[in-house]
Amino acid sequence: MPQVTKTNNENEFRLTRSKVQHQESISTIKNTTISNSQHKQQTQQQISSPPQVSVTSSEGVSHVNTRQYLGDVSNQYITNAKPTNKRKPLGGDNAPLQKQQHRPSRPIPIASDNNNNGSTSSSSNSSNNNNNDANRLASLAVPSRLPQKRQATESSTNLVEKLRVPQPEVGERSQSYHKKSRLIDYEWQDLDEEDNDDQLMVSEYVNEIFSYYYELETRMLPDPQYLFKQTLLKPRMRSILVDWLVEMHLKFKLLPESLFLAVNVMDRFMSVEVVQIDKLQLLATAALFTAAKNEEVFSPSVKNYAYFTDGSYTPEEVVQAEKYMLTILNFDLNYPNPMNFLRRISKADDYDVQSRTLGKYLLEITIVDYKFIGMRPSLCCASAMYLARLILGKLPVWNGNLIHYSGGYRISDMRECIELMFQYLIAPIEHDEFFKKYAMRKFMRASTLCRNWAKKFQASGRDLFDERLSTHRLTLEDDDEEEEIVVAEAEE
């Protein structure tokens, strides 16, 4: 009988056994001198007593192969394997991308190749008694073979039948439409009624959609103090980084939604992870690459992003950084984009192109300036629309419709955000690429227009929050008061 070297690996053991059988078949072919009677006796002996493979060590001592388990084999390879450290693509200490949870698993026995006489002569009664227990355990261990979609449907249906949550009445639901639970003391018109025939405007449940957005935006905000918690990162570095991101966004002709999502993803990542200075550009590139795939119809290739970095990073590094960034953020890109809130407010502004263009410029100030980190997007949109209407000289600057379709923001709620925007306009130009972008003709030269107005407004000494400029009604109460304001502005 040929000797087989002892091994604990299942695959190697089975390969060795196949070699032994192959050698036996070759030896039987070569021994042509054996008679037919002897050949029949040998085959009968093989059928009556199955062949036993003995395991012989190098010392010549025969050992019987014991029962092996998959768990023992895997544990042996885990203990013998050398630990490999995966370096974070965006800097920091060596660590895996995500900690894997160790789940203790019961070892699965492999059928032994040695069939002892005692095992072959087991009684039929004991096997019948164990069949019931085996079937019961198999039904618990083996997962259902139903399709996943059918399983999810059945589980959700059973859950709904058990809960039977009572639905609120119409009067109760109307109170949850607004983010702020306060008494509505302003006049407003139902402008969504005009869109009942337009299915794309979803006027039936537009209030529920924005009510969900108002709750979601607070959860997706970054840490407003993360710039001061990191020892290497400074506000000036973020300003340069976002200005470069605006340049790349304009070069690729992407949607505004992609830029807002990229900055939000970048800020949220740096709120929980420390990024080295030489990896900031890689982080911004990966953030815009991820945002474009989420917002755009046709996203640029990763090679274009790597080329825009002047060869600092390869496409493989951009993809690796994207994977790590999404892993840290739990793949949560459900960010309520500020452009949705701006379009909602524009309905109360009669979709005026000028105020909307100026509002987009003022809204992008909130992503390039670090002072706006942590402010709600809906608040920034309402403040941008207020300041845009004030620049264009629209009266009233803020009325009941604008309060309602902005989410319930009054001037007192927007005071801090409006002051920060105004301070940015009167300050020297800090973000060159951002200023050049909105100095173009297609953007109505919004950056130049707003800065010139801010300097004149500051020189006049007027109040940004003049009570005569706003009302809780749809129009100003007194027409004579409106004429006085217009005459005063003309004299100045």
Swiss-Prot record:
Example of a GO MF term: cyclin-dependent protein serine/threonine kinase activator activity
Keywords tagged on the record? Cell cycle, Cell division, Cyclin, Mitosis
What's the domain of life for this entry?
A: Eukaryota
Annotated SMART domains: CYCLIN (SM00385), Cyclin_C (SM01332)
Q: Where is the composition biased (Low complexity)?
A: 34-58, 111-135
| Region (Disordered) residue spans | 1-176
Q: Where is the composition biased (Polar residues)?
A: 23-33, 59-83
Its GO biological process terms?
cell division; filamentous growth; meiotic nuclear division; mitotic cell cycle phase transition; negative regulation of ascospore formation; positive regulation of G2/M transition of mitotic cell cycle; positive regulation of mitotic sister chromatid biorientation
Where in the sequence is the signal peptide annotated?
none
Query: Among the entry's GO cellular component annotations, what is one?
Result: cytoplasm
Pfam families for the chain: Cyclin_C, Cyclin_N
Coiled-coil zones:
none
Q: What does this protein do?
A: Essential for the control of the cell cycle at the G2/M (mitosis) transition. Interacts with the CDC2 protein kinase to form MPF. G2/M cyclins accumulate steadily during G2 and are abruptly destroyed at mitosis.
Record family assignment: Belongs to the cyclin family. Cyclin AB subfamily.
Protein name, entry field: G2/mitotic-specific cyclin CYB1
Please report the organism this UniProt entry assigns to the protein: Candida albicans
